[in-house]
């Protein structure tokens, strides 16, 4: 709150001093002296502002000094007094601000001339006076301040200002008591009179003031802009410090000072020496700047750092040599150990301390070069390794020779992307054919076991002539759909048997190859699964029953032998549609959750009820390809309640067993 009042009293928009705000601040400080430091600090900041604000701040400081005695200690500090000296010595300061500052310094110096508890006022006044500055004449109506006497006898003569002035006479009852150092005459160590002690204190305070100002001037001096030897104020301060140093030495060597003053003189002597050394350093920097052609001087290279670097390099070389000697067996440390009679482990410990383990290698090692040249090889782990398995002989032992034979082909323009001619039979085709052949043999054995009870007259019995095996040996069967077909001269195997179709004509040793399938006719009954008329190769059970009742004997006597037609031999594109009505429609034989019976149950029922049905139904059915043969429709009673759809087997099979071997 008090700082806000200070800002209000020093507002640059004010035409004249706001005495109401000034008196309000004074009343607050008299009630609560704790705010005195903050107020003085805020006024010190205002001295760095514009000229109008500086004038208002000086007027506020003068009024607070006269009305509030708690501010004397803070105004006498070095920070505030240094700002006053800066305003006076700065060439850019306006004339009215400089005259007002000189007037305040003179009045405060005379008012606190005999006050050694606050020596800052008189030190600043004496310094400015010795510096040659002329103080402006005092106005006739200016108040005369006197704070030198004791609080009981202190009087302040005041005059009432008529033009834009206010009475600044403080009441004597509110004056605080201060201990006067000069009134104590019994503290003199030499037993001198009381008049000699105030003179010494006055000299010490003046020397302190001049030394502090000299330090401030040198610290703010820019060597590139101004020469310290050409500045008159710095010259005068330098001479004053020289004389003060001589005087301080005399006072220390006299022995007439007490212990308290002796400590003060010793500290003062140190401050003077530091100020003189700084002055000499400024002169040297200015001289180097002029010699460099009025250009900034780069920082000098420190010779000590260079010497230290050289010493470190020498030590490292010595360490490397000693390390190499230790490896060769010729150590030089053993002799020193014997002479000094020190244990060997101490020398080894010292050597380890001297070795720089973080130093980069001097040369390139051949191991690093070899490691960079070699490609990165990721370590491979065998996840399928079985330690209990017996070692097996390697099959492809001639692989390096094959690689050597393939290299010239690659050099002569071998292109891996171009499809190369394949062999006659791939390994994959042979594997599929062998597996299919083994499945057929197993299925045939199962069929023989199921059909042996029906006798030799059973047309569904599997004869030994239909087997593909020759002399009991299993030969690989190569399908027609393989990538590479065998030549024409090679004997073709017998096609896969369809139990529901007549035996096709055998063409062993002939040059006839299966032709292409017939064209697909989309508008025929063969391709329409929703047509009511049955297709040629899918006769339903109802029609079969009717035909069996009308012509049971003609089927046995007038059964023509169907000749092999190569046109339908390789017909893999013949459509065969599933019987959607058979799913869930069979109420009599609903043993399968999909509405169909097992294949063996169907076969047994067909053999008991309709043994010769297959010849009439499959009279016009074309034979399928050698590789993909589809099963004929299941023979079931016509129980379809949906009507219009033919009952046929949903899943194509190769044989009677019901196991699908299609790939």
UniProtKB/Swiss-Prot annotation:
Biological process, per Gene Ontology: protein transport to vacuole involved in ubiquitin-dependent protein catabolic process via the multivesicular body sorting pathway
Signal peptide (UniProt feature, chain positions): none
UniProt short sequence motif NPF 1, positions renumbered to this chain: 386-388
InterPro entries associated with the record: ENTH_VHS (IPR008942), GAT_dom (IPR004152), GAT_sf (IPR038425), TOL_plant (IPR044836), VHS_dom (IPR002014)
Pfam families noted in UniProt: GAT (PF03127), VHS (PF00790)
Stretches for region Interaction with chcA: 351-356
Compartment(s) where it occurs, according to its Swiss-Prot or TrEMBL record: Cytoplasm; Membrane
Domain called VHS: residue spans: 9-136
Span(s) of short sequence motif NPF 2: 458-460
Biased composition (Polar residues): 162-172, 522-536, 648-663
GO-annotated cellular components: cytoplasm; membrane
Biased composition (Low complexity): 174-187, 302-340, 439-472, 495-505, 537-571
Residue numbers covered by motif NPF 3: 528-530
Sequence repeats (start-end): 386-388, 458-460, 528-530
A Gene Ontology molecular function term of the record: ubiquitin binding
Record SMART domains: VHS
Region of interest: Interaction with tsg101: 357-663
Gene knockout outcome: Cells show no change in the morphology of endocytic compartments.
Keywords, ordered alphabetically: Cytoplasm, Membrane, Protein transport, Repeat, Transport
CDD domains per UniProt: GAT_GGA_Tom1-like, VHS
Topological relation to the membrane, as annotated: Peripheral membrane protein
Assembly description: Interacts (via GAT domain) with ubiquitin. Interacts with eps15 and chcA. Interacts with tsg101 (via UEV domain).
Role description: May contribute to the sorting of ubiquitinated proteins and transfer them for further sorting/trafficking processes to the endosomal multivesicular bodies (MVBs) pathway. Binds to phospholipids, such as phosphatidylinositol PtdIns(3)P and PtdIns(3,5)P2. These phospholipids are involved in the recruitment of the ESCRT machinery to endosomal membranes.
Free-text comment about domains: The VHS domain binds phosphatidylinositol PtdIns(3)P and PtdIns(4)P. The GAT domain binds phosphatidylinositol PtdIns(3)P, PtdIns(4)P, PI(3,5)P2 and PtdIns(4,5)P2.
The protein, known as: Target of Myb protein 1
Organism name: Dictyostelium discoideum
């Amino acid at each position: 709150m008090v700082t806000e009042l200070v800002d209000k009293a020093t507002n640059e928009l004010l035409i004249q001093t706001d005495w109401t705000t000034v008196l309000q601040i004074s009343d607050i400080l008299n009630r609560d002296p704790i705010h005195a430091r903050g107020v003085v600090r805020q006024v010190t900041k205002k001295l760095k502002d514009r000229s109008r604000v500086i004038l208002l701040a000086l007027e506020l400081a003068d009024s607070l000094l006269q009305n509030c005695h708690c501010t004397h200690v803070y105004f006498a500090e070095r920070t505030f007094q240094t700002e006053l000296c800066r305003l006076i010595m700065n060439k850019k300061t306006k004339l009215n601000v400089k005259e007002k500052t000189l007037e305040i310094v003179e009045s405060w110096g005379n008012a606190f001339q005999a006050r050694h508890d606050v020596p800052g006022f008189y030190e600043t006044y004496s310094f400015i006076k010795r510096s040659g500055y002329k103080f402006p004449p005092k106005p006739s109506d200016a108040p005369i301040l006197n704070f030198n006497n004791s609080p009981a006898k202190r009087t302040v003569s005041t005059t009432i200002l008529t033009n834009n002035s206010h009475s600044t006479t403080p009441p004597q009852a509110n004056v605080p008591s201060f201990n006067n150092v000069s009134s104590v005459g019994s503290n003199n160590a030499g037993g001198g009179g009381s008049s000699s002690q105030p003179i010494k204190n006055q000299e010490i305070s003046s020397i302190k003031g001049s030394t502090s100002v000299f330090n401030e001037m040198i610290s703010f001096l820019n060597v590139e802009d101004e020469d310290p030897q050409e500045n008159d104020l710095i010259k005068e301060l330098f001479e004053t410090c020289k004389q003060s140093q001589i005087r301080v030495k005399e006072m220390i060597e006299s022995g007439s000072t007490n212990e308290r003053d002796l400590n003060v003189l010793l500290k003062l002597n140190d401050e003077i020496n530091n100020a003189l050394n700084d002055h000499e350093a400024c002169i040297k920097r200015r001289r180097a700047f002029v010699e460099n052609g009025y250009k900034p001087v780069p920082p000098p290279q420190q010779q000590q750092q260079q010497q230290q670097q050289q010493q470190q390099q020498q030590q490292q070389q010595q360490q490397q040599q000693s390390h190499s000697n230790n490896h060769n067996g010729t150590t030089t440390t053993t002799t020193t150990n014997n002479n000094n009679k020190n244990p060997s482990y101490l020398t080894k410990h010292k050597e380890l301390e001297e070795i720089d383990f973080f130093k980069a290698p001097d040369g390139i090692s051949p191991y690093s070069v070899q490691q960079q040249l070699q490609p990165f090889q990721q370590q491979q782990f065998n996840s399928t390794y079985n330690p209990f398995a017996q070692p097996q002989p390697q099959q492809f032992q001639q692989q390096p020779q094959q690689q050597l034979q393939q290299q010239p082909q690659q050099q002569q323009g071998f292109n891996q992307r171009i499809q190369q001619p394949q062999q006659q039979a791939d390994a994959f085709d042979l594997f599929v054919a062998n597996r299919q052949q083994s499945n057929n043999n197993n299925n045939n054995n199962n069929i023989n076991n199921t059909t042996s009870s029906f006798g030799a007259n059973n047309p569904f019995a599997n004869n030994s002539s239909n087997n593909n095996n020759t002399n009991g040996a299993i030969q690989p069967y190569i399908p027609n759909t393989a990538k590479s077909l065998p030549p024409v001269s090679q004997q073709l195997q017998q096609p896969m048997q369809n139990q529901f179709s007549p035996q096709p004509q055998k063409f062993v040793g002939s040059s006839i190859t299966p032709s292409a399938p017939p064209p697909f006719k989309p508008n025929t009954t063969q391709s329409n699964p929703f047509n009511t008329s049955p297709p040629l190769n899918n006769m339903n059970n109802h029609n079969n029953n009717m035909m069996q009742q009308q012509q049971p004997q003609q089927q046995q006597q007038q059964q023509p032998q169907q000749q092999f037609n190569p046109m339908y031999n390789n017909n893999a594109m013949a459509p065969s549609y599933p019987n959607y009505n058979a799913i869930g429609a069979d109420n009599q034989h609903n043993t399968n959750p999909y509405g169909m019976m097992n294949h063996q149950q169907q076969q047994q029922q067909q053999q008991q009820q309709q043994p010769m049905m297959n010849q009439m139904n499959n009279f016009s059915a074309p034979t399928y390809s050698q590789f993909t043969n589809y099963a004929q429709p299941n023979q079931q009673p016509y129980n379809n309640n949906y009507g219009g759809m033919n009952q046929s087997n949903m899943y194509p099979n190769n044989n009677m067993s019901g196991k699908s071997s299609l790939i």
